Amino acid sequence: MTNEGLKLPSYSMLDLEGYLQPAGTPAQQIAMKNLAWTMLETYRTPDGGLGSRLSNEWLGEQKWYVQIIPHHQIMYEDSPWLLPLCLTLQEMRVFDILGTYVSPPAEDKSTVWQLKIDREQIGTFFNNYRMGFHLLYCQARRFAIHGNDGDYAVYAGSEKFIRAALPPIAVGSVATAKVIAGIEEEHGPGCMDGILEHYAPFMID
């Protein structure tokens, strides 16, 4: 059977078919998934599992910055933090928003969704993938938002993008410290040390 005849697994918590649209044929979705992985790498999580994160090589090549935020702030259809993101994407004229599951070992073949610039759709995407690693991006790779198991998300792109797409209180070292403190309170001290070390060269002060 060719890829044209396959229906790719979505790995979402709920069936999103009919609410979000697949980004083309299975073959086209696989191509879009491969594009996502040009920005990512796999790594060992603190519990010994295999996860994904934004690649330092990609971040450095693109001269991108990152900002870690609480995942719950973007996973509801009326999340206020999604409003500046939608406005920023509209101003950037980025209309081919894509979302997909990026938890290994499902690196290559899983549904890639086509999303509208809409708080309800974007919030629903982040909510339904909160139990794994997931990525919101566009075909031109002008930005990326990487979600991690419902604990946190990483906004990545130009400093201008990050500052425009998030509330001012969500940007900078003080905001990052608050996010880390909340995660460590739940999962234990030091659980974020590896992630902080990985993203340190690209964080906004």
Regions found by a protein language model. Give the residues of each.
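Structured alpha/beta or helical-core interaction and ligand-binding surfaces enriched in interleaved
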Residues: 1-153, 157-205
